[in-house]
Amino acid sequence: MEIKEISVPQQGVVADYMNGKKEIQSCFDYMLTEDAFKQRLHDLREREFFRQDLVAHLLEYNTKLQAGESTLQNVKALGDENTYVVIAGQQAGLLTGPLYTIHKVISILQLAKEKEESLGVKVVPVFWIAGEDHDMDEINHTFVAKNKKMKKTIFYDRNPKKASASESELSVEDCRNWIEEIFKTYPETNFTKDVLKFVDDALKKSNTYVDFFAHLITKIFANSGLILVDSHHPELRKLEIPFFKRIISKYKEVQEGLRNQQEVIKELGYKPIIETKSHAVHIFMEIDDERVLLEDQQGKFVGKDGAHSFSYEELIEEMERNPARFSNNVVTRPLMQEYVFPTLAFIGGPGELAYWSELQQVFHTVGFQMPPVVPRLTITYVERDIATDLFDLQLRESDPFLNDVDKLRENWLSNQIEEPIDDHFEKAKKEIADIHTSLQQFVKKIEPGLGAFAGKNELKINEQIELLERMLKRNVEKKYEVQLNKFRRIQFALRPLGAPQERVWNVCYYLNQFGLDFVDRVMENPFSWDGKHHVIKL
C-alpha cells in the first residue's frame, strides 16, 4: 500500500473550522492544539465518573462479543482515574454500513494511540453503537455493482416496526440469503469463501441488528483494543438514569440553549441542521413497542400528539422502574456520552461536526464543556487497475477528487476533436433559425394559411439537426469507447453516484478483494490530522 494526501475543498462549518476561522471555532470549547488537550485532561480530572460500574458492564458486554485480550485490558484500565477515552459513534449498519464507519474506528484507534504517547496518560478507543436508533432505512442496505451501475440493495425485514436497532430482531436465514446475493456481485477471489465464513460466523451469533454489527466490528478489529458500547443496552441504561433525570429537570434550559446556539450559527452565516419540534424535551420513551419523542405540553410530558401524558413525578418514577424505556435523541446523545465517559476527544464526520457546533450552549446548561471535536480521517482506496486507468488518461490522482468525473470525461473527449461538436451545431442551429425566420415571414406574406405548417417545418429541420448531432457524438464515443470506459470505471470506483467512495462502498468488497487482514494493513499507514484526504493505492 502507498498513501498520499491531497487537499480536497470543503464547505461550510467543516471548512472554516479546519481553516482556523475564529468565529466558528468559538462555537467549540477546545481548539485542536496540544495545550487544549492538556487543558481538557485538567478539566476531566475535576469531574467524577461511575468508572467501576461502567467497567463491570463493558467487561460483560465485550466478553460476550468475544473481544480480544487487548480490548478487555483497555476496559479494565477505564477503572483507573487517569484513563481517558477517544470516542466516535455510528448506527448499526448491516455489514457495518458504508466504509466511513470503518474509517471512524481507524480514526479513534489512531488518535487514542497518538494522545497516549504525547500526553503520557492511558487513552482507550471507544466506539458507541447508536443502538437506540429506530430509523431502519439508514441501516438496512448496502450498495453493490450491478449491470455497470451502483444499486442500493435493501434487506427487507419481515416484521418492520418502529423499534430500536438493539431490539429489532434479525432473521438470520433471510439475512444470510441477502448477504450471499451481495457476494455474487463481487468477483470470485481466493478470499471469497473465507470472507463469507467470517461474516456468517458473526451472523450466527446475532439476534438483532446491533448484535450483527458489534460481532462483525469486533472480528474486523480483533487485536486493536477497541471497546464497543451499545447505547441502548439495558444495563448501561440503568447507569444513565441519574443523567436522564437531570435532562428532564433542565429540559427548558436545554431547549433554550439549543435555540440560542442555533441563532449564533445563523448570525455567523451558516444554516442549522438540527431540526426538532419546538416543544421536544429531547428524550424518547418506548410506548406500545415504538420509540416516541416526548414533548412539553402545558406542564405535562406527552407522546403521540397527546395520546399519552405524564407528570414530572410520573416520568421520574417510570425512569426508576423501567430505565430501558428511555433513550436519547440527536441533541441529548452527545450529552450522555459526555456523562458516561471521560472523553478526551470526540471524533465525527463533516455532518456531525456541523451539528455539534449547534450544541455548545446545550452542553453548558447541564454543566459540561464540549470535548475537543476532531474531524475523522477521510480515505479513498485506489485499486491497481484504476491507477492504470488514471495513468492512461493522463489524469493526476487528485483529479477525480477536485473535479466532477463527468466533466473530466467531457473535457478529455473535446480535446480529442479538432473542432468542438457543440459549438458547430449551435452555430448551425442559429444560422438555420435566422434563415427560417425570414422564410416564414415570406411564406406568411404570400399565403398566411401556411404559417403553422412553416413553423412545424422549422421544428422538423431542428429535429433532424439534433439527430445528426446525436449520431455524430455516438460515433465519436464509439471511436473512443476504450478510453471512455476508463472514465466510467474511475467514477464507479472513486466517486460512485457522484459521492465519495467511503459513503457508498462497503468494506466487504475490499475484504473479498484483498483478504481478511485488509483493515489491519490499512492501519499500518501513517495518517495525519491536517484535514487532507488520504488516498491509498492498493
Swiss-Prot record:
GO terms for molecular function: ligase activity. Its EC number is 6.-.-.-. Keywords: Coiled coil, Ligase. Residues 248-268 form a coiled coil. Pfam families: CC_BshC, Rossmann-like_BshC. It is an enzyme of class 6 (ligase). Belongs to the BshC family. Involved in bacillithiol (BSH) biosynthesis. May catalyze the last step of the pathway, the addition of cysteine to glucosamine malate (GlcN-Mal) to generate BSH. HAMAP family: BshC. This is Putative cysteine ligase BshC. It comes from Bacillus cereus (strain ATCC 14579 / DSM 31 / CCUG 7414 / JCM 2152 / NBRC 15305 / NCIMB 9373 / NCTC 2599 / NRRL B-3711).
